[in-house]
Each structure stands twice: as C-alpha cells, then as structure tokens.
C-alpha cells in the first residue's frame, strides 16, 4: 500500500465545502470519485484543512492510500481529465506511509482578499470581497497584534463549531495592500469554524473607523460570539498553504491576480 500526496486547487462557488455531504456536491466527493475510477477501487482522502461552502483553495494538500499500480502521471493527468474544471491537481508525489495531510501539519495559511475600490469589478466579483469605502490598513494591523499567540477564540467561532477547544495559536495576522487589493494573511496551527471570516468581519469595522484597534482585544476577552461583527462572505477566502516538518506548500492568491 502506497501513500500519495496531492496538491489541489479549486474554486469553491459550486460546492458545499470540502467535506462530503449527502445533500450537496463537495470537493471531497468529486476528488474521491475521480481517484476511485483511476485506481479501480474505492479511494478515501484526507485533507489539510476542511474549507467551508464557497471557500477556495490554491494549495490544498490531500493524501490517500492505494495499492493500485499506477504511474504518478495517472494520479495527476488521468484524474484531472475526470475532474470538473473548477477542481484540479497541481502536483502529486509518493510520501512516507506515516504522513497524514491533516495531523502532520504544523500550520496552515489563509488569504482573505478585499477589492477596495470605489467601483466594483465584474471580473473579480466572485473572487474577492468588494469594499467601496476607504480602509485604514494601519489600524487594522494594530488590531491584528491582539490576535497573535495561543488564545481562546470563542468570540470568533461559529455556533456550529464542533472543535473540542476554542484555543488556537496564531503566528501571523497581517493586512497587505497591493494596488486596489488588500490581502489579509493569517497563519495558525488550525482554525475554528468560520473563525477567519469572523475575524475579517470585525477587522473591517476597525478599518472603517467604527471601532478602535483595542476593540478587538475587548471582543477576544469577552469569549462571546455576539460581541464580534458579522461573518465576512465566503468568496474572498482562500486556503493557500500548509507547512509540514519535511516540506511546505504555498501559493498566495494575490500573485495569481497580479
């Protein structure tokens, strides 16, 4: 039995998220269906980060086991031929049998993209959140400092979150402006359900001047979801990278835009 790693890109608009669901199409379902056909046996995959409905990925990492004798090209080109246009395998390699894309991961990186312009863009409408009001990046980054380290993020977790603990360790949280785009990059060991989108929603209130940077600290300490702002829309969020002890994978979405 061999263990294979896949690097996946997908556009999440047409899916209920990564995880297989009985009521709607999912990225996992499409990938397992294509892999199973190439392997001529049932294939089940594990991913580094289970993205929500409408969320995208430029570098999702997946692993699966198979005893099917296939060249690496079959696992990439062959499977890609069976996948829909909004899901594709970028790379494939054989890895140690102990490797697990989820549990071996040290940290995960997400980008949230904001198109900050007076006029909306028909081209980018489905790829980023449009905000026509000017955002104060400096104040947003001041607020981000309160997010760093291991903390209780109860104020930013969904009511449907099934995690056993609200504690997460954030190593980086930063807004970067590139032309009309503002990129929120966040790196952490893991994230709660809707956590990043809830953070973005609250940080936008700071950037628009409705709240001070210190307000984020107050919300964190409240440990109460009702104290934070509304959840930012899903279509601006991208899973862009994973770090493992032996290697890392990262494809920043803004570099694909610019």
From Swiss-Prot:
InterPro entries: PsdUridine_synth_cat_dom_sf, PsdUridine_synth_TruA, PsdUridine_synth_TruA_a/b_dom, PsdUridine_synth_TruA_C, TruA/RsuA/RluB/E/F_N
Keywords from the UniProt entry: Isomerase, tRNA processing
Keyword tRNA processing set for record: yes
GO molecular function: RNA binding; tRNA pseudouridine(38-40) synthase activity
EC number: 5.4.99.12
Record: residues binding substrate: 110
Gene Ontology process terms (BP): tRNA pseudouridine synthesis
Protein name listed in UniProt: tRNA pseudouridine synthase A
């Amino acid at each position: 039995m061999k263990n294979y790693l896949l690097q996946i890109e997908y556009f999440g608009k047409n899916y209920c998220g990564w995880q297989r669901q009985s009521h709607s199409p999912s990225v996992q379902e499409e990938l397992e269906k294509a892999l199973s056909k190439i392997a001529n046996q049932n294939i089940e995959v594990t991913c580094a980060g289970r993205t929500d409905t409408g969320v995208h990925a430029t570098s999702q990492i997946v692993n699966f086991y198979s005893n099917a004798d296939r060249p690496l090209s079959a696992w990439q080109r062959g499977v890609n031929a069976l996948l829909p246009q909004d899901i594709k395998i970028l790379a494939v390699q054989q890895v140690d049998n102990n490797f697990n894309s989820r549990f071996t991961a040290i940290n995960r990186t997400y980008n949230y993209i904001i198109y900050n312009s007076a006029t909306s863009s028909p081209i980018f409408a489905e790829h980023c959140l449009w905000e026509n009001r000017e955002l104060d990046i400096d104040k947003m980054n001041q607020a981000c400092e309160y997010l760093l380290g291991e903390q209780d993020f109860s104020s930013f977790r969904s009511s449907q979150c099934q995690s056993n603990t609200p504690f997460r360790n954030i190593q980086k949280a930063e807004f970067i402006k590139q032309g009309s785009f503002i990129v929120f990059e966040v790196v952490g060991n893991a994230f709660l359900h809707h956590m990043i989108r809830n953070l973005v929603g609250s940080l936008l209130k700071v950037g628009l001047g409705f709240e001070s940077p210190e307000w984020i600290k107050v919300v964190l300490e409240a440990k109460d979801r009702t104290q934070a702002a509304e959840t930012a829309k899903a279509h601006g969020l991208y899973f862009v990278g994973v770090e493992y002890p032996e290697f890392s994978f990262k494809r920043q979405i803004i570099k694909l835009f610019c």
